[in-house]
From Swiss-Prot:
UniProt similarity note: Belongs to the universal ribosomal protein uS14 family.
Function, in words: Binds 16S rRNA, required for the assembly of 30S particles and may also be responsible for determining the conformation of the 16S rRNA at the A site.
A GO-annotated cellular component: cytoplasm
Subunit structure: Part of the 30S ribosomal subunit. Contacts proteins S3 and S10.
Biological process per Gene Ontology, one example term: translation
Protein name: Small ribosomal subunit protein uS14
Disulfide bond positions: none
Any coiled-coil regions, as ranges: none
The entry's keywords: Ribonucleoprotein, Ribosomal protein, RNA-binding, rRNA-binding
GO molecular function, one term: structural constituent of ribosome
Domain of life: Bacteria
Length: 101
C-alpha cells in the first residue's frame, strides 16, 4: 500500500490541475499563436512559468484507487493489475472473466 501522504499529494495535484487548467490553455494558445506579437508571447511564457509546478497535468501519476500503487495501473478499471485480478476472481467486475483458449 502506498503511503497516505502520497495519495494526498496526488489529490492535491489533481485539484491544482483542475484549478489552473483554463489559465494554462489560454497561455499556451498565446504562445503557439504566430499572429501574436513577440512581446505578448514572451509574457505568456513568463506567466506560464509563474504557475505552480504541480498544476501541470504531466506531473500527475495514475494510482490504484484501493492501494495507491503507481505501477501496473489499468485505466479501464482505475485499479492496479493485482486488485483487478483479485476482484475478477471474486466475480466483482461485471463482464470480466479469466481468459481460456
Amino acid at each position: 500500500m502506498a503511503k497516505t501522504s502520497m495519495k494526498a499529494r496526488e489529490a492535491k495535484r489533481a485539484k491544482l490541475v483542475a484549478k489552473f487548467a483554463t489559465k494554462r490553455t489560454e497561455l499556451k494558445a498565446i504562445i503557439v499563436d504566430m499572429n501574436a506579437s513577440e512581446e505578448a508571447r514572451w509574457d505568456a511564457v513568463l506567466q506560464l512559468q509563474q504557475l505552480p509546478r504541480d498544476s501541470s497535468p504531466s506531473r500527475q501519476r495514475n494510482r490504484c484507487n484501493i492501494t495507491g500503487r503507481p505501477h501496473g495501473f489499468l485505466r479501464k478499471f482505475g485499479l492496479s493489475r493485482i486488485k483487478v485480478r483479485e476482484h475478477a476472481m471474486k466475480g466483482e467486475i461485471p463482464g470480466l472473466k479469466k481468459a481460456s483458449w
